[in-house]
Regions:
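Extracellular/periplasmic catalytic domains that process cell-envelope and extracellular macromolecules
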Residues: 6-10, 53-55, 78-82, 93
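Structural recognition of the beta-strand scaffold that forms the well-ordered cores
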Residues: 12-17, 59-62, 85-88
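Metal-dependent active-site segment of extracytoplasmic phospho-/sulfohydrolases and closely related
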Residues: 42, 46-75, 80
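Active-site histidine-anchored catalytic micro-motif
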Residues: 70-90, 95-109
């Protein structure tokens, strides 16, 4: 349905949701099938996008509002953790196979230099969702558009994740 809406021009963006990841107990047995389902869903999305001839116009952003703790709780679950990740996918993207950001041995975010994208505890900053969204908006050419007028990110470090 989403790919058909893109193909017809009815929409240029959509949110797709897969739930069940909030696993405060029996984490592994719940996450394993969810991750497999997610992988299959992403693969199917790209297959349909190819079939509909729109794959070269899609930027897929995959993320979550929070991560899971690096350790298990007393019920073999994992609780909320402020460190998450975002995956960006695009057909024939010039910025493929990059990992930007890092955590220390305690799974705490390390500071990243916005210019070099390397670990820099002195001059860097922790990457937050606002940095990713600002960079994606710029990449898509909507950073200073009327769409963003009341939703701009001010006083935010500027990362060029797509260089």
């Amino acid at each position: 349905l989403t790919a058909a809406a893109f193909q017809s021009g009815l929409t240029s963006a959509a949110d797709l949701y897969i739930g069940g990841f909030d696993t405060h107990s029996t984490h592994d047995s719940l996450h394993e099938p969810l991750l497999a389902f997610s992988t299959d869903a992403i693969q199917l999305f790209w297959q349909i996008a190819e079939e509909k001839g729109i794959a070269d116009r899609v930027t897929l952003v995959i993320g979550s509002d929070f991560g899971r703790t690096p350790h298990y709780n007393s019920t073999d679950g994992k609780d909320h953790w402020p460190i998450g990740s975002v995956v960006l996918m695009e057909k024939n993207a010039p910025w493929t196979n990059k990992i930007i950001g890092n955590t220390d041995e305690g799974h705490n975010a390390q500071k990243i230099n916005p210019d070099t994208l390397e670990i820099d505890e002195k001059n860097g900053t922790v990457i937050y969702p606002k940095h990713v969204h600002k960079a994606v908006r710029r990449y898509l050419g909507i950073e200073n558009s009327s769409v963003e007028e009341n939703l701009e990110f001010t006083n935010t470090e500027d990362f060029n994740f797509f260089a």
